[in-house]
Amino acid sequence: MLMTGSVGDGSEFDWEDQKTFISRDGGLTWRFVHNSSGLYATGDLGNIIVYIPYDPEEDGDFQSEFYYSLDQGRTWNEYELTNAISSVHPYKLINPTPDGSGSKFIFKGTFATTDSETNSITSLKGVEYIIDFSAAFDSRTCEEEDFEDWDLADGKCVNGAKYKYRRRKQDAQCLVKKAFKDLSLDETPCNSCGESDYECSFEFVRDANGLCIPDYNLIAFSNICDKSKDKSVLVEPLQLIKGDECKTPMKIEPVDIPCDEIPEEGSSDREIVTTENKFDFEIKFYQYFDTVADESLVMLNSIGDAYISHDGGQTIKRFDTNGEKIVEVVFNPYFNSSAYLFGSKGNIFSTHDRGHSFMIAKLPEARQLGMPLDFSAKAQDTFIYYGGKNCESILSPECHAVAYLTKDGGETFTEMLDNAIHCEFAGTLFEYPSNEEMVMCQVKKKSSETRSLVSSIDFFQGDNKIIFENIIGYLSTGGYIIVAVPHEDNELRAYVTIDGTEFAEAKFPYGQDVSKQEAFTILGSEKGSIFLHLATNLESGHDFGNLLKSNSNGTSFVTLEHAVNRNTFGYVDFEKVQGLEGIIITNIVSNREKVGENKEDEQLKTKITFNDGSDWNFLKPPKKDSEGKKFPCDSVSLDKCSLHLHGYTERKDIRDTYSSGSALGMMFGVGNVGDKLLPYEECSTFLTTDGGETWTEVKKGPHQWEYGDHGGVLVLVPENAETDSISYSTDFGKTWKDYKFCGDKVLVKDIITVPRDSALRFLLFGEAKNMGSGSFRTYTIDFRNIFERQCEFDITGKKRADFKYSPLGSRTGCLFGHQTEFLRKTDEKCFIGNIPLSEFSRNVKNCSCTRQDFECDYNFYKASDGTCKLVKGLSSANGADICKKEPDLIEYYDSSGYRKIPLSTCKGGLKLDAHLAPHPCPGKEKAFREKYSINTGAYALVFVTILLVIFFAAWFVYDRGIRRNGGFSRFEEIRLGDDGLIENNRTDRVVNIIVRLGLCISLITKSAFQRTKAGVARFSSKLRARFGNRKGPTYSSLLQGQFSDESDGLHEDANDLSSFTSQDSNFEIEQEDAYRPEQEHTSQIDQPATSNIPDALPARSAIHKPDSTAVRNEDE
């Protein structure tokens, strides 16, 4: 067999990496043939093999060649086509003998003719060769002694028999020269049957130890109990593989299956199948491979035994390590089929096919330190391992960490950097890296108390650049690397880079609650912003701080919310809803002043934002609980009565998030309705299906939850309580059913499914108290059979309407500058499967910008009236800083107080971030003046030209229409329609029309003036007659600054929204249909109104419109 392929797990394919291999034992073993791909053909029953590379220049010369072997692929010879045209590209290679027994081959290819002067291709031509091997070995024909017997599978039994085949010896110097005949295999049945000759009977499946155990779902299908009148039946768990030829069967003990444990016909839950597996030791670690190929996962128990399952835990096999215990399991975050198991004896077991196969390699001779691996985001086999060198003991003076690099998946390691404790392949993380080979490492020498940050572009073979001499630590997120650097007075500073070379200090906003930057937590990044929590109170057990958000390059932060809860370990009650833009849930400390003074314990309240942190609201509570009763609090104010949820800081497993990336809009949470968050055990379980807009209490008491089939199956199990049942819903939480999954009550510690939440199988980890051996158990609950069919996916809507596009909740308007609809299932009787619904959302339309598309800029805060005002005593960001970052700029702008939310795609409409007047960058004053200076010479020329045209036209009309007709002295004598004017041609007539028109306008103006003057005189006379007894005139003064406002300046507090409206659009804030979530503090600007100006601001009309009464008094 000759094949083209590559060595790997099959997850990647690249034609440039394809090589050619050969096997002469039916594919059992393979040998390398050539470092390229090409055409191949065989002759003389496989004794002649011809191979031609697709690229004739792969060997470095232009001469075309082919390769051949006469010893069944052991050795190869090159034959150059010396008389041929160079660079012939093959497209066909065949043995013209139909059965492949001939010794001649036909090779067809193409070559290009080029122009000798321009070296360009002028035409393509075909060429054909006949390759003849009939004279090989001096035309000697093989005899009987040139043949041998070949045993299939190295003589092992295959399907109960051994097989032999007669073929030419590999080193025989002859050709067979016989026509092909059907294979005549010498078959010898094996005497005794072995385990390899058997498979599980239909009613059984294999468990973790490879034993066949009853599957009651299959038993129900087989109807074996219906054929028996007894309460139980005996069934052999093994059956001989069909077609197996072994003679003596194994003795198989039948299994007694109780028929009363089989679900009866008509049971509502008969299609739900539960598979139980028992363990003597607790399962401490478990994780799925994040793929759609199957439901593979790795589990590790408390004594270091590893288990593999490929069907969601139904069948579990113990991983054979030859007695070596597994101390750690690490998954590759960039390549979802790869994982690494570290053995206690220094071996590393790696898989790149989700645990179907493993490769074993030896770790470097170093002590395992338990530090996580660091992987390359672009090379699957490249990662960094950290080991301890000179470590007889961790406390040894010479013991230190060493970073080891592997580029072949762990088969070989090279020592990369001493004292490195954390490295990252920075060049693979940035969108636009300065060098793709860049590696950054944090170095901690044992003799020093400080840590430094270094980088290299050759894995520290020669290049070693120190970036920071002293750091606290660093991490990467979403295309950024953030470094925490100590500062004077026990403060911290954060530096950010987006290319690995240029670092800029992150500017945090200052306020009354931020006195020092002592601790911060990076919460992640998404679409051009970093979310960060800056601690403002570090009292143990009473920690909280401000939630910040950066601009696109991560250097300028603004405050989104104050007093956001954190714990002593730096974890924060902050969670972005998966799959939906801009929805974040946080818990705030509502009594932060008294907590800061140690007078009260923390009182937490839950808030949500629908526009990426610009506006926050309390959660709307449901009207009734799961029993149909009203909640104790019914205040209209959400500040006094809202829903509160326990957050990230209290989770046992950080993977248990509120939401799911595939069940769009759905979130579970444990909480309560009231004025503050109650203790966990006093709370209930709530569900939302519209992204947090509305909530429903689904179960009393705390529950664990899991999503399946993109939210088509929802499962709840009681938390911290023994149970034998789960609750599930197949209609998105509208109704719930209970299902009993085991006979004895167990304490369920966790419920999981595949990371994409698309499977119909759920895996529960439980512990049965007082059960002795086998008290630790897993239960795989399979919902695959409860649906009638799989949903038909057709986004065109021409077929069955199992899906439709719809908005999320009531938000039918614009959000982040666009209106989005999501694809959702309409028929509850079908299941979705692996269809990636989250990838099929669509933007219905783009929208004009409104106030909701902007957030406050650096050192600005959002006031109660919805405007952004400058923090008292602070200044806006120095716009000139951008000149340092971009040396080619010649100008910069001051901040308007607003900046556009990075998620927003709006166009036109409100322009709150519009630039003010430009300023020259330092040192670019001359270029600035040249750009904006007026060209006086050009303007003077235009002005003079216009004056000359006007003067010439006036002189022409005067000369031809006035002077020639008697001059100005006759002007008053001319009447309209007078024929006394001279008109000798068309020009005279046009000039006279202009003269008459001027006369008409002059007379009308004069008459209007005289009438107005007479009317004013009469009115004045009447006033004097009526008020003549007054002592004298009175006046009313209007002071210049009477109605001015200190906040009227745009640069200082940016509070006049109307001045930003686009000149070419009539869009207004109140006229937008965009969704506006209810505000905690309602402001005029966020409500429908008839005015463009917030109530808190002075009306512009009152400033610029004169008071009619005042004017009238002044005219007296």
Swiss-Prot record:
Biased composition range(s): Polar residues: 1084-1093
Subcellular location: Membrane
A Pfam family recorded for this sequence: Sortilin_C
Biased composition (Basic and acidic residues): 1073-1083
InterPro entries: Sortilin_C, Sortilin_N, VPS10, VPS10-sortilin, WD40/YVTN_repeat-like_dom_sf
GO CC, one annotated term: endoplasmic reticulum
Membrane topology: Single-pass membrane protein
Superkingdom per UniProt: Eukaryota
Keyword terms: Glycoprotein, Membrane, Repeat, Transmembrane, Transmembrane helix
Glycosylation sites: N35, N336, N553, N846, N985
Main location: membrane
Any one of the GO BP annotations: protein targeting to vacuole
Transmembrane segments: 934-957
Per-repeat ranges for BNR: 21-32, 67-78, 307-318, 404-415, 607-618, 686-697, 727-738
Region span, Disordered: 1069-1116
Protein name per UniProt: Uncharacterized membrane glycoprotein YNR065C
Species per Swiss-Prot/TrEMBL record: Saccharomyces cerevisiae (strain ATCC 204508 / S288c) (Baker's yeast)
Organismal lineage: Eukaryota, Fungi, Dikarya, Ascomycota, Saccharomycotina
